[in-house]
Every structure is written in structure tokens, then in C-alpha cells.
């Protein structure tokens, strides 16, 4: 199992999107996440990468990922990855993350993503936020978002100036939005 010791977070660069495929076809959630990932990558000035695992994935689908913003696509082609298995996909994805070190990893809130995401987070000793409705790394853009979606007095609230990912999701049955 992968393990981090005294992690140097400065070594982590880039935004990644796990691109789901079924029967060789990349799923629509992948394109949606790439579009969001592109915004984050632009704000951070880093590369956006798509990660596809499977076997015999249609090459046209892989090429299309660039049209949705991916600067690079990692395609792990192995017959053992043709159909999703929790342990197989988690091992391959975690190994790739340990090797390449992206700072942000986006995984869709699908059945597959809800299985894979927590397992990878646990193996990599990192956090996970599910069901996000807004993502931001730019504090000014985040303040603008809050002005239009909340009652927070943004101008009189102190915000730490950093590029940490701010993840907004529903809380308390959807009656409140929480940013993590």
C-alpha cells in the first residue's frame, strides 16, 4: 500500500480528472469535470490531465478529452482494467498519483466515483469532499461567488490569501452550503 512520510506538498503540481469509461466509451461526467478542472488549472497556472483506465477504449474518445481542456491524457490500457474493480482501479490510480503528484484530483459523484474516491483518499492519507457544487482556488473569484450565493459580509470577513482548493457542498439536508 502507498504511504506518504513527511510529505512535501510543494512537490505536488497539476489538476487531474479521473475520466470514467464504460465499454470503451468515456462517460459524460468526464467532460464536465474536465471543463471545471480547466478553470482551476488556469487559475493555478498548471497542467490539466485526464486519467483513463481500461482496455480497448475508443481512440476518438481519448482524443476528444483535449477538446474539453486536457493538456495531457494518461491512458492505462490493460485487459485487467477493462471492467471496474475497486482494488484494481484504486491501486493503479494511487500508484500513478504517487508517481506524478497532482495537487488536485477530481472524481465524479457517480457510483464508480463514490467507490473509488474514498478508497484512494484513504490509501493516500488525504482528504476528500463529496458532492461539491462549486470549486475555486482564486480568493477574489471565491469572494464573488459568496456575494451572489450567501449572506456573508464578504468585505468585512478575513480570508486567507492562498491557492488552496475551496470546495463548496450542500450541508444539513441542502438547507446550508458549506465550504471546506
Q: Residue spans of the language-model regions?
A:
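N-terminal glycine-rich FAD/FM-binding segment characteristic of electron-transfer flavoproteins
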Residues: 1-180
Amino acid at each position: 500500500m502507498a504511504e506518504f512520510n513527511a510529505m512535501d506538498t510543494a512537490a505536488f503540481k497539476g489538476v487531474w480528472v479521473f475520466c470514467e469509461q464504460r465499454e470503451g466509451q468515456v462517460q459524460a461526467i468526464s467532460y464536465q469535470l474536465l471543463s471545471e478542472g480547466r478553470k482551476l488549472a488556469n487559475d493555478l497556472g498548471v497542467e490539466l490531465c485526464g486519467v483513463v483506465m481500461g482496455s480497448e477504449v475508443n481512440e476518438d474518445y481519448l482524443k476528444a478529452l483535449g477538446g474539453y481542456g486536457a493538456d495531457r491524457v494518461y491512458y492505462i490500457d490493460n485487459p485487467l482494467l477493462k471492467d471496474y474493480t475497486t482494488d484494481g482501479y484504486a491501486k493503479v490510480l494511487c500508484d500513478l498519483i504517487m508517481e506524478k503528484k497532482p495537487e488536485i484530483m477530481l472524481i465524479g459523484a457517480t457510483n464508480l466515483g463514490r467507490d473509488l474516491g474514498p478508497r484512494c483518499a484513504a490509501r493516500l492519507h488525504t482528504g476528500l469532499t463529496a458532492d461539491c457544487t462549486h470549486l475555486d482556488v482564486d480568493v477574489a473569484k471565491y469572494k464573488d461567488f459568496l456575494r451572489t450565493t450567501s449572506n456573508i459580509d464578504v468585505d468585512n470577513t478575513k480570508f486567507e490569501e492562498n491557492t488552496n482548493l475551496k470546495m463548496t457542498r450542500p450541508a444539513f439536508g441542502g438547507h446550508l452550503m458549506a465550504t471546506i
